[in-house]
Curated annotation (Swiss-Prot):
Endonuclease IV plays a role in DNA repair. It cleaves phosphodiester bonds at apurinic or apyrimidinic (AP) sites, generating a 3'-hydroxyl group and a 5'-terminal sugar phosphate. This is Probable endonuclease 4. The keyword DNA damage applies. Its cofactor is Zn(2+). PANTHER family: APURINIC-APYRIMIDINIC ENDONUCLEASE, ENDONUCLEASE IV ENDODEOXYRIBONUCLEASE IV. The keyword Hydrolase applies. It catalyses: Endonucleolytic cleavage to 5'-phosphooligonucleotide end-products. It comes from Mycobacterium leprae (strain TN). Belongs to the AP endonuclease 2 family. Binds 3 Zn(2+) ions. Zn(2+) 3 binds at H165, D204, H206. It is an enzyme of class 3 (hydrolase). HAMAP family: Nfo.
Amino acid sequence: MLIGSHVSSTDPLAAAEVEGADVVQIFLGNPQSWKAPTLRSDADVLKATALPVYVHAPYLINVASANSRVRIPSRKILQQTCDAAADIGAAAVVVHGGYVADDNDLEDGFQRWRKALDQLQTDVPVYLENTAGGDHAMARRFDTIARLWDVIGETGIGFCLDTCHAWAAGEGLIHVVDRIKAITGRIDLVHCNDSKDEAGSGRDRHANLGSGQIDAELLVAAVKVAGAPVICETAEEGRKDDIAFLREKTSG
């Protein structure tokens, strides 16, 4: 099982070595900006490495939005991110589900997601990530994810399970992998994060493993059953220990 972390984009391979990571995730630009990613000077090095590199798309992306001033730039930067990810030989691009203005717009939001994927031109796999909060989110509640997947599942989109987000969404982590796989048929990547807040809080505040509100054994169980590469999106101080903890608990 590949276990690693989200690291600084400055020198991801060096960071992986320091943290003992088998796999890394990076941003290719400012995650809070609409500015397109710039080409990396180390693109050839990253493309040649045996270490899988995942890319997290900007947080601003919301292809489900009815607001064209949000939706159209979202589609554009998703395409630009996928293009930049291809340039470094990325394993996949991870993107949040986004949201709509109210529950009456959910079905249209699902269709906007489908249109965005149909228009996307890339050979890099794209993974939808479940999110922590939002009353009208596309990927917070599992029942809503199921409705979205009915519309987009056949496009070949993958799924990234974030443990903190599932906890914050109020979904809990008992049998979480089985429940998601019953919807999507797949889990391609796990973001293994503890949570600083109580279950159902709707707050996306990650904690190092064992230092938050989630029973560490539930995190280990989810990682084991998922059988997918794992990324710890936790604080740099303690992240090396998070990787070592998961590696010890999942070995053998």
